[in-house]
Structure formats: structure tokens, C-alpha cells
Amino acid sequence: MDRRDFLKSTALATATAAATRLALGQEPVAAAPRTTDDDVTWDKAPCRFCGTGCHVQVGTRGGKVVAIAGDQKAEVNKGLLCVKGYHVGLALYGADRLTRPLLRKDGKLVPIAWDQALDIVVDRVLANPAGFAIYGSGQWTIPEGYAAQKLIKGGLANNQIDPNARLCMASAVTGFLSTYGVDEPAGCYDDLDRADVVVCWGNNPAEMHPVLFSRLVDRRARGDKLVLIDLTTRRTRTSAFADRTIFFQPQGDLAIANGIANLLLERGTWDRPFVEKFCNFRQTTDPLTLDGRPMTFDEYRQAMSAYTPARVAELAGVSPDDLSYLADLFGRRDLRITSLWCMGMNQHTQGTAINDLVHGVHLLSGHFGKPGDAPTSLTGQPSACGTVREVGTLAHGLPGGLVVTKAEHRTEAEGHWNLPPGRINPKPGYHTVEMWRRFSTPSDQGGDIDTIWVQVTNPARSLPNVDALFYPSRKLPGKFLIVSDVYPTATAMAADLVLPSAMWVEKNGMFGNSERRTQQWFKMVAPPGEARDDCWQTIAVARRLHDRGHPGMKDKDGKFLFNIVDETDRPVPVWDWRRYYDVNVDAQLFEEYRRFSRHKHKDLAPYAEYVKARGLRWPVVEQPDHTWRETKFRFVRGDDPYATKDDVQFYHSVTKDDRALIWFHPHQPPPEVPDRDYPMLLCTGRVIEHWHTGTITMRIPQLQRAMPQAYCEIHRADAAALGVADGEVVTIESRRGRVDLPVWLDGRGQPPPGQVFVPFFDESIVINLVTLENYDPLSKQPDYKKCAVRIRRRASP
């Protein structure tokens, strides 16, 4: 089976990816191959869905997107797309697009004018600037996130901004920071083409990142010898392709990583020269910090010695033979090993710890710094890296890896923004769970967030324990919810004010994908009705604040915070929607933002370079001939321009000595363990047809028909014990809430006895009523993978 066969066979790609025409209102949409119609105009864009960053060719005619094709010139996907990518053009054309601002009056949302809507937002800010927050997204474009970041941290100076990416990749961030002193993977997708072994740590790339996974399938089809290891808590499509599937108990991944390290040390197969030259050792402290406490090699060896194969079998349910097999692979110098992970490691109350430990296994074994030797996290949103991690739209962050808690970082940011000294607040804002907890708490009981502006996300369905974190605010006096979105999501329908937004190629944009690749596209079609760019909305609010005298909307020279100019350097009133596209606002915001990028050697090229390219991987450095060169492998001399001392140089190391940190973290139990009342463990996740809460994909007819409803996977033995048959509706209940949904036995995935899997794409089946909000103490990322539940047959109505 080659890559194309794999993609066609995965889920409904058999039926849809091969289709040549798809209905789109009165216009056809080509799903591939690319049409040759003379009147179709083509341009490039990254896909709107996951963090892979596939490139598509977008065909437009008569002001509509009418065709989509994989981009043959793109290194990421080489012309291939998954089933969502082939249908991405339909994302714009759901029947219920939001086209006018809406205000809640007498319990109903009624249309209002944009001027009134913007004035309402400004009134809320001025009434309590400290209590105004923005909740954003890894689906923001880079300029959108940068504008929101500058408004909150450079203008309002309250730092109350956080993204939904806190829920999906925050633990990956803290893992990279605590290991290397700087965020994001050192390797890139090229590692998948060079690895001899790929280890999937609790993720399912066959469905979640199918175009990347197809690289592995294609290599096998060409006769390459490739070993795929699936470390997992349930059987998935990835398991079907794996050479060895190793099942472990939820939260057992920490013990497995420690067990591998112990065997490497015990057998003497760790890479002594690499470790002695490039690594230091660290252990956790109380309270926890990203820096930890130094430990000697002997202390590290002693700590790891407790994780014998027998002990790991007890903690993780992994056999000694399986653990020995993993240690044998990592102990071999003649192999190149790439580890992949995603939500299974990140949505974890010990997410930072397990990220650290997997990095540590690679460092201890020397499987780092060569093509195919890489620990690589994958992201789920198209710009969780570019807009969240790089622009710094987290409660504590500033662009380019700066943080608000460091005086020198605040000074640098104030310099880039031309702000008066002291403008930036040194106190971090609230992380996502705390932000929504405060919003859902009465103002006189500590609920000091009274207005949240949600952009490009659906927290009414994506927050954990949503009945505690989201819905109480809807009944509290003084709380006000603003939502900018393209469709009437559950969040929008609960809002006090709804602002209709432009989407994807209805606006200019830039994304940053999982391999540090920054991507650019131009507006190709107009948004419907009165829908407008999120970036414009932010700038328009800032201008009205400026005009009403808010001092934070001016820099230290008295200029407007968003001073966009024409080619003669004259200000352009881009806050007036009629003038917004007189100039390229994205280009000017990006050029301002990229000044930050050199602080942690995340250098970005000029905007014009991204117009020409299918993305560039940072750091991107200008060459003597004035061309711009991207970096495939960070910290590696000969490829990374900042690695100059040795073959590998960790030039942002926590210990300031060019050494990475190998951590010891002890095994910890899950946040909830099964008991007599709640005897099973629930894990939530995604399916190939749908993306996140289904806002877009459930409005694409082909995808909705293929997977119309969420379901519950349980083992046949559990179904027999419960007396339920395939397709029968059951009730899943936790200490927090309950949902009813049908059982699917022997479907795509199969959990072991005692475990349950439910996808979260279905707005009508709110599985996050059941989940818990316990989070990692460092990353503040919640655990969606392990909560105790009970299942019973649904009572008759």
C-alpha cells in the first residue's frame, strides 16, 4: 500500500478523495485532480485544519472557491491531502454562516450595526479594563494573534489573554523549555523519511495526522525497512500498521520512559560520550519549577534503578519483554529513532513530566541531532505553533519567546512597540481554566473577569467540565460574553454579543505549523454579508478606545498603537472597514512582529519571502547573496546557523552551558482512578472525518454523512457485562455530569476492558460535561484522557 492508497482507504477517503466534483451551492468544487478550466484562478494556501500544515491549491471563480487540489510544490504534503483537506473549500459555505453582528435582547440574539457592536465592546473595556479578557486560538492567523496580544499586553496592560491551545500543546511547550531552554521541535518532517524506527507515544497519527503517516506507509511500499512501534492505551488505525503494538495502562507512560532509561543504564547501552558532552541532570522540586534541582549522574542512576521491568509491569501493565524490546532499540547506535506524540502525552496531569522523560530517553541514548533521530511533538491546530507559541499569546508570554515576568523581556518588548517604560504588566494573566473559572464565579466572590471576548474557538464544547467552567457565567449578573466566529456555535448561541468573522481565504493570513514552518496566503474571495476579519475587529476596537481617551492605545510618541501606513509613510485609517484592504495590514504587522524573533534565534524572513515560498522553517537567516535560508535541524552544526561550537549545541540551555537537561520524574497515578462507583476510565479524542468540536466539518455534508454522530467505544467483554448491544444507547456518567450516546463495538478503535473512548466532535453530545479540569501543575493543561466513569443502559423515556 502506498501513500495515496493509504489516504484513500482511511475512513471515507475511498468515497470522497477520488471524487471529481462536489456540490457547493450553485458552484461545483473539484476535490482533485486539479481542474484545467481556463476561468478558474488558482493560488496557494495552507489547509485550514490540523497542525500538519499541508498546502492546497485553491481555485476560485465568480467570487467563490470552486476547487481544491493538493499542492504538488509543497514539501509538507507533496500534493496529497487527507479527507478533510480535500473538502476544505466547503468549509466556507455552510448554510448558517454568521453575516451580521447580533446582540442579546430580552433573551434573543437580534441584528445590530457594526458601529453599535464595536461601541459595546469598548464600553465593556472601559467599564473594567482589568476584568476584560481575550480567549483566542491556535486557529488565529499570526497577524490576528499578534494584534490581540498587542492590544491586551501593550495597550490594556492586564495580560488577560490565553488561547484554546492551552488545552492541547502547553505541556509540549514546558517540556521543550525545561529540556532545551527554548520551545518547539529540533527536527522536522524530514525525520520521517530517514528514521529506521518510529515510536508513537500514545497518539494515533494514522487518523489524526494522516498525510504525515502516509510518508511511513509510502516508505514501506517502496521496500524501506521501517519499524513502527505503537505505544497506546487502545487499539487504533495506527495499531493496524504497527510492527509492534504495546498496550499500557493510562498514566503508565511515565513508568515506561523511566524503565527504558533504567535498562539503558543497567546494560551500559546509553550514549556516554553524547551525555557527558551535551547533557546535565535534573530532578523535580517542591514547589515545581521549570528549572528543577541539579542532580548528579549517580543520583539519576539511583533514582531510575527503581523502575525495573517488574516494577514497570506493575505500574504500566507493559510486559518485561516489551520494555526490553524498546530499550534494545534505543540502545542501538546503528538505528535512527524518531518519537512522535500529541494529545496523549500533552493532555495529562503529568504532561510536562512525560514530555521531559521522552526527551530524556532520546538524549540518554544519543538519538538526537541526526536526520531521523528526533523527539517530535505534533500539534492539532494550524497555527498553535505560529500564533500561540511564537507570537506568545499565552497569559505569561510575549512575542518571540519573551515572558512578562522578566524585566529585561518587558523592556525589550516595550522597545519594539515604542511604549513608555513600565507599560507592560509583570504579572501573568489567568491561564485558560482559571480564566473561565473566574468568569463563572460571582464578582463578589473572586470572579474578577467580567468580560471575555472569544475569537476562533468554541469553549462551550471544548473546555473540560464545561458545566462548571462555562455555563454558570450565563446566569450571573455583570458577566458579558463576546464571540467572534463564522458559524453559530454553542458558544456563539450562548453569547451576549456575536461578531461575524471572515474565514481562511476570505482574508489574508499566515500560519505556523508543527515543524516551525511559517506559511502565507492572500485573500481570494470576499466574506459573506457583513462578516469581517478578526484582525480588523481588534484594530477597530483599539481605535475606538483611542478616540475615547484610553492612554494605552498610544505609543510613547503619541501614535496609535496600530499605526498602519501607506508607501509614503502616511497613516491609513484601517479601522474603517472600507479602507482595511487599501494596504496589506498582515505584512506590516508581521514585519513589526519579526523584530522579536531574533531573541531566541527564531529568526523570520521578510514577509515577501513567504509570498514566494510554500513556507519556511525558522530560524531563517539571510545569506551573503541576500537569499534566505531555512533550518531543517536545530542545534546541529552545519544546518542551524547558530550552532557553531560542536556537532550539537544547545545554545539556549537552562544551565547556560550549551547542555540539554535529562530529567528524573517519578511515576504518578492518574487524576482519577476507577472505584466501585465509577469503575471505568474515559478517554476523549478525535476521528479522521471531523476536527475538534465539529464547527466546520459537521457543516461539510460529505463529512457529516460519513460520521454523523459521536459514539462510545467499549470492549465486548464490558458490553456483555452491561448487557448492551452494538448501536444501543448508553449513559456515561462521572462525578461531574452525564451524556447519552450509542455504543460502537469493534469499530475503528477498541479499548481494553475497563476503558471507554468517546470523540468530542459532536456538539449535540457534550462529552465535556463528563471530563475533569485537573491540570498539569506547570503547563496548566487539563487531562482529557483519564476520568473515572460508569456506564449503564439508558433508562427508557
How would you name each of these model-derived features?
Residues 534-603, 677, 693, 697-713, ...:
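Long, contiguous, secondary-structure-rich segments that constitute the structural scaffold
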Residues 146-229, 254-258, 359-493, 502-509, ...:
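Extended redox/cofactor-interaction regions of prokaryotic respiratory oxidoreductases
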Residues 240-248, 517-528, 699:
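Short beta-alpha connecting loops at secondary-structure transitions
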Residues 135-141, 314-318, 342-349, 380-381, ...:
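Conserved short loop/turn motifs at secondary-structure junctions
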Residues 117-132, 188-196, 303, 324-338, ...:
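Glycine-rich phosphate/diphosphate-binding loops that line cofactor/substrate pockets in enzymes
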Residues 503-524, 530, 750-753:
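Catalytic or ion-translocation cores adjacent to nucleophile or general acid/base/metal-coordination motifs
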Residues 105-111, 269-320, 525-647, 682, ...:
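N-terminal leader/propeptide and maturation segments of large enzyme subunits in energy/redox metabolism
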Residues 1-269, 277, 281, 292, ...:
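N-terminal export/assembly segments and adjacent metallocofactor-ligating motifs
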